[in-house]
């Protein structure tokens, strides 16, 4: 009986310890959360990547970025842009929930940049669904005339008027099991050229 009691106490201690660790992580995420989207911010993202690399288990890091975003900001203003960012966050969250994988992670780097961490096959599926659903969610934020034309007229960096395409989304995916990359920065640096290349592709 004494042994059983000890086992029960040991199990409770372990359970409370695990609960305390989870609460600490949640607290850190809340403190670091984006005020706009409520998603975990840069510190939580960095910690999540570090944990995955340390675990030596294969995962995919997906960097989500919006194209033609700066001209949209200049044309429509920051208040309206904030609504677009929140809508993008809702789209990403919806696809993450559809995947039904609580171990997956979604973070907001800031501005129009987001991060998804998931298992490789699931990450690819999530990203495909995000791309497929993106246009339908974003077009409503344009004026009817711009929506119908498929572009809007704004000013470039030199102040010249020109046509700008509607916002699209680019997602760069990097996969590792801790063998190639040692730090979150290593992964981010590897994702950057992939993202820039993807932005040059049509569609």
Located regions from the model:
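HAMP signal relay modules and closely related sensory coiled-coil linkers
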Residues: 1-19
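Polar/charged heptad-repeat coiled-coil helices used as signal-transmission/dimerization stalks
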Residues: 14-28, 132
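Amphipathic HAMP/coiled-coil signal-transducing linker helices
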Residues: 23-42, 74, 78
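Two-component transmitter module helix at the DHp-CA junction of histidine kinases
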Residues: 24-28, 97, 135, 139-146
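Conserved long alpha-helical elements within nucleotide-processing catalytic cores of c-di-GMP signaling
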Residues: 41-60, 70-97, 107-111, 115, ...
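Nucleotide second-messenger and two-component phosphorelay signaling modules
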Residues: 49-60, 64, 75, 94-105, ...
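A short glycine-enriched loop-to-beta-strand structural element that forms part of the catalytic core
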Residues: 108, 142-193
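Flexible, glycine/charge-rich interdomain/linker segments that couple
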Residues: 178, 197-203
């Amino acid at each position: 009986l004494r042994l059983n009691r000890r086992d029960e106490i040991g199990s409770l201690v372990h359970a409370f310890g695990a609960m305390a660790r989870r609460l600490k992580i949640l607290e850190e995420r809340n403190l670091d959360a984006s005020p706009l989207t409520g998603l975990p911010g840069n510190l939580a993202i960095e910690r999540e990547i570090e944990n995955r690399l340390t675990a030596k288990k294969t995962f995919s890091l997906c960097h989500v970025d919006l194209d033609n975003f700066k001209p949209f900001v200049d044309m429509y203003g920051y208040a309206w842009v904030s609504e677009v960012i929140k809508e993008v966050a809702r789209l990403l969250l919806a696809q993450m929930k559809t995947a039904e994988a609580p171990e997956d992670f979604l973070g907001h780097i800031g501005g129009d940049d987001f991060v998804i961490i998931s298992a490789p096959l699931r990450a690819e599926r999530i990203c495909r669904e995000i791309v497929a659903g993106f246009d339908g969610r974003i077009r409503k934020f344009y004026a009817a005339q711009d929506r119908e034309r498929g572009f809007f007229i704004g000013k470039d960096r030199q102040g010249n008027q020109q046509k700008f395409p509607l916002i699209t989304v680019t997602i760069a995916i990097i996969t590792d099991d801790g063998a190639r990359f040692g730090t979150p920065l290593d992964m981010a640096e590897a994702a950057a050229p992939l993202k820039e290349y993807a932005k040059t592709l049509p569609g």
